A protein has these predicted regions:
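Acidic-aromatic/histidine active-site loop/patch
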Residues: 1-3, 255-262
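Active-site signature of alpha/beta-hydrolase-fold catalytic machinery across serine-
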Residues: 21, 25, 47, 135
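Conserved catalytic-core segment of NTP-binding enzymes
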Residues: 28-34, 115-116, 120-209, 215
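Phosphate-binding loop that captures ATP/GTP phosphates
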Residues: 41-81, 208
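C-terminal boundary of histidine-terminating zinc-finger modules
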Residues: 221-239
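C-terminal alpha-helix
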Residues: 242-254
Length: 262
């Protein structure tokens, strides 16, 4: 399996939406895709038609000792969804303490699913530094850092790079990091200027295109689905497809170590 951790040092960059739509594109291309939510907001499921009143998820399953197979949902576009789940505050803290104490928890749990070498796991994480992001990076084959074309995102890049260097880069099976610029409005001069700076700074690590700002993204979420499913001919949908092709060209070139295949 290949594990893609979708991360960001700051909130409000559209990370969950990007993770959902990339998972959707990959699934429609014939890959088996697991969309795994490691964010307590439990929002990734909303893109895949998981019932709003469902409380099941990996947090509750882990605390109760249940197998993850029991909380896997068949989502739209053929994506298998592993929600975070709904837990009370005390249980959330217990869950966080557990995964902080068990750094191999995520990788071992994924291996229990007996995924094939070609299967893809897309992990959504909370913004910034957290036990969830650290856990995802400890299991990741590749990290995808989502940024905006603004000064705040530019300034936050070193923070996430330090986390990747600490928790992912030392592993021999980690294949590197990529960057994608989301919610781009090409009519703004500042956006164009920041894009130039990001391309100079990040070079080949940066997806050569962008994800354009598109009202269809919000509309698709309101319909409990992905943009790829809701409006496949939109500009952002084309961007997601191009980004997924670039992403998989990077990920598929990474050798899979024997220990990373269940």
């Amino acid at each position: 399996m290949k594990v893609i951790a979708v991360v960001s040092a700051k909130g409000g960059v559209g990370k969950t939406t990007l993770a959902a739509n990339l998972a959707s594109v990959l699934a429609t291309s014939g890959r088996r895709v697991i969309a795994l939510d490691l964010d307590p907001q439990n929002a990734l499921r909303l893109h895949f038609g998981v019932p709003l009143d469902s409380i099941d998820g990996l947090s509750r399953a882990t605390l109760s000792g249940d197998a993850w197979q029991s909380i896997m949902f068949d989502g739209v576009d053929g994506v298998t969804v592993l929600p975070y789940g709904a837990v009370v505050e005390d249980d959330r803290r217990r869950f966080e303490a557990y995964i902080d104490h068990e750094p191999q928890w995520l990788l071992q749990s994924l291996e229990s699913l007996r995924l094939d070498a070609s299967d893809i796991v897309v992990i959504d994480t909370p913004p910034g530094s957290s036990v969830y992001t650290r856990t995802a990076l400890c299991a990741a084959t590749f990290a995808l850092n989502v940024v905006l074309a603004d000064a705040a995102s530019y300034a936050a890049i070193p923070q996430m790079e330090r986390m990747i260097d600490a928790y992912a880069a030392p592993r021999p099976d980690f294949g590197g990091v990529g960057y994608v610029v989301n919610q781009v409005d090409q009519s703004r001069q500042l956006t164009k200027d920041v894009l130039k700076v990001l391309r100079h700074l990040l070079g080949e690590k940066l997806f050569p295109g962008v994800i354009h700002q598109d009202e269809g993204v919000s509309e698709s979420l309101a319909c409990d689905t992905t943009l790829i499913h809701y409006d496949p001919l939109s500009q952002a949908a084309a961007d997601f497809r191009a980004c997924s092709q670039w992403l998989m060209s990077r990920v598929d070139s990474i050798a899979v170590s024997p220990g990373s295949v269940a």
